[in-house]
């Protein structure tokens, strides 16, 4: 198992070197372009242990939230693990930050943020998150983690609804 994890980490390094997994380029990519890239990355791995390791590495690559933001208000309901989600608005653009106390869940929320952060509320609300079934994520999660994934997506979309309504009232 250690060898498998090492191989997955090496592949993540190769993915980053090829320029596929670069946070700074997502500002210019559409949600669908990012989803297609995620699908391509996950297709590089045949074994789900490697895919889990990729998720863990993605989660560990995220900046941790300050303790001051790990509040009940930022906690996502419906997740077995503790997941905090923060949304910042920059003009019309929504930027998400998150953290979890569970490694795989931290990776899942990092993946959602990668796809949805940096886009407008309308783009987020209109997004069909087809990458989730295409990479096989839901079928390889326990029912409780699958419910948590649904709750994370719901919370991100709720932020988009709230900011969209706020913009319409101004």
Can you say where each PLM-predicted feature lies in the sequence?
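Short, Lys/Arg-enriched N-terminal segments with co-localized hydrophobic residues
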Residues: 17-28
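N-terminal intrinsically disordered, cationic/polar leader segments
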Residues: 31-39, 43-82, 89-90, 132-151, ...
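Hydrophobic residues embedded in beta-strands of well-ordered beta-sheets
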Residues: 92-94
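A short interface-forming secondary-structure element
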Residues: 100-101
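Alpha-helical support elements that line or immediately flank enzyme active sites
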Residues: 109-119
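Glycine-rich phosphate/pyrophosphate-binding loops
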Residues: 118-135
């Amino acid at each position: 198992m250690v060898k498998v994890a090492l191989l997955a980490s090496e592949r993540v390094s190769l993915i980053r070197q090829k320029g596929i997994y670069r946070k700074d380029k997502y500002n210019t990519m559409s949600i669908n372009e990012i989803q297609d890239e995620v699908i391509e990355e996950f297709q590089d791995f045949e074994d789900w242990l490697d895919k889990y390791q990729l998720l863990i590495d993605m989660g560990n690559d995220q900046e941790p939230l300050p303790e001051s933001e790990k509040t009940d208000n930022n906690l996502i309901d419906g997740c077995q693990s503790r997941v905090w989600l923060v949304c910042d608005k920059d003009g019309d653009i929504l930027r998400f930050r998150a953290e979890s106390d569970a490694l795989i869940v931290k990776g899942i929320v990092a993946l959602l943020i990668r796809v949805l952060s940096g886009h407008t509320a309308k783009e987020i609300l209109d997004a069909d998150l087809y990458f989730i079934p295409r990479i096989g994520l839901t079928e390889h999660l326990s029912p409780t983690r699958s419910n948590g994934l649904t709750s994370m997506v719901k919370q991100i979309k709720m932020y988009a609804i709230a900011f969209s309504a706020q913009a319409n009232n101004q």
